[in-house]
Swiss-Prot record:
GO terms for biological process: nervous system development; regulation of canonical Wnt signaling pathway. It is found in: Cell membrane. It comes from Danio rerio (Zebrafish). Keywords: Cell membrane, Cyclin, Membrane, Neurogenesis. GO terms for cellular component: plasma membrane. The gene is ccnyl1. Key regulator of Wnt signaling implicated in various biological processes such as embryonic neurogenesis. One of its GO terms (molecular function) is protein kinase binding. This is Cyclin-Y-like protein 1. SUPFAM superfamilies: Cyclin-like. Disulfide bonds: none annotated. Pfam families: Cyclin_N.
Length: 339
């Protein structure tokens, strides 16, 4: 998952910039310039972001910033624990499996190969907490389901006042991932793009726009991160009643609001993966554990050897490239003198 894709900002695009960017521009404008008469070239140290700005950075861009969905879920987690403590609710039979000397329980989900079903459950739960604990109802017309319906069925009048249940969000996302044959990594990147959109455009995901925002994030993540490219017309065949023109328009607005920043560093991806696992533990959505058998141990060993061989090959290629860069530096060997 070390691959990163970046894109330049369109000169004609005019997405709404967040407050952090305005403060960053003020900081750069106040940078001292040398009194030399020659042309001034800004040093890389002059472009470093101050600590107070780095701490307020968007979590979808910087690994040190905490994810938004995890902080929004903590309120419900604390209330649930407090209610159980006051009402003396017993946890009942412990369903969590623990390893012992004779048996080791492991799940089949890793940061590089997450479990698809469990990951989609966690991602949709994060979206559920985003909707439930939203600050307001800031939205745009392009994401309004009443103005741009996804089906021919009439949208209820109270659609903007009823929060969707977790099962409804999971069913919607699961249908798209199953039909388009998307991977679990794509689900994590979908959540990254979703939180980046909410931060950059200063929006809230709410009952009136959650389907189109999630669809736009999945559409973009599948094109950037999935090995098999999914076209907009493919989603039109899945949703049946949506038009290609509507999909193209929504994708264009989504990219503009992201300021064409589709880069997801490996550290940010890993942070979202482990925060999703924490969210699963807090909500009793633990990943399925199975005892370690000889067959699974051999499979893990084979995967480890495959990764090890791949990294060895990459290091050899990098070493050969460095030696053959300009034919000036090579490996020098000296004869040993034995006495």
């Amino acid at each position: 998952m070390g691959n990163t894709v970046s894109c330049c900002v369109s000169p004609s695009g005019s997405p709404k910039l967040p407050r952090q960017v305005e403060r960053l521009e003020d900081y750069q404008n106040n940078t001292d310039i040398s009194d030399d008469t020659g042309p001034y070239l800004q040093h890389i140290s002059d472009r470093e972001v101050p600590d107070d700005l780095a701490l307020e950075s968007n979590p979808s861009d910087h690994a040190r910033a905490s994810t938004i969905f995890l902080s929004k879920s903590q309120t419900d987690v604390r209330d649930r624990r407090k209610s159980n403590h006051i009402n003396h609710v017993s946890p009942g039979l412990l369903s969590k499996k623990y390893s012992s000397c004779s048996t080791i329980f492991i799940d089949d989900s890793t940061v590089s190969q997450p479990n698809l079903k469990s990951t989609i459950k966690c991602v949709t739960l994060a979206i559920y907490y985003h909707i439930k604990n939203r600050d307001s109802d800031r939205s745009l017309d392009i994401f309004d389901e009443k103005m741009h319906p996804l089906s021919r069925e009439q949208v209820p009048d109270d659609y903007s006042r009823t929060d969707p249940e977790h099962k409804l969000i999971y069913r919607f996302v699961r249908t798209l991932f199953s039909a388009a044959q998307l991977t679990a990594e794509c689900a994590i990147v979908t959540l990254v793009y979703l939180e980046r959109l909410l931060t950059y455009a200063e929006l809230d995901i709410c009952p009136s726009n959650w389907k189109r925002i999630v669809l736009g994030a999945i559409l973009l993540a599948s094109k950037v991160w999935d090995d098999q490219a999914v076209w907009n017309v493919d989603y039109c065949q899945i949703l049946k009643d949506i038009t290609v023109e509507d999909m193209n328009e929504m994708e264009r607005h989504f990219l503009e609001l992201l300021q064409f920043n589709i880069n997801v560093p490996a550290s940010v991806y890993a942070k979202y993966y482990f925060d999703l696992r924490s969210l699963a533990d807090d909500n009793n959505l633990s990943f399925p554990l199975e005892p370690l058998s000889n067959e699974r141990a051999q499979k893990l060993e084979a995967i480890s050897r495959l990764c090890e061989d791949k990294y060895k090959d990459l290091s050899r290629v990098a070493m050969r490239r460095s030696f053959s860069a300009d034919n000036l530096v090579g490996i020098r060997r000296s004869n040993a003198v034995l006495s």
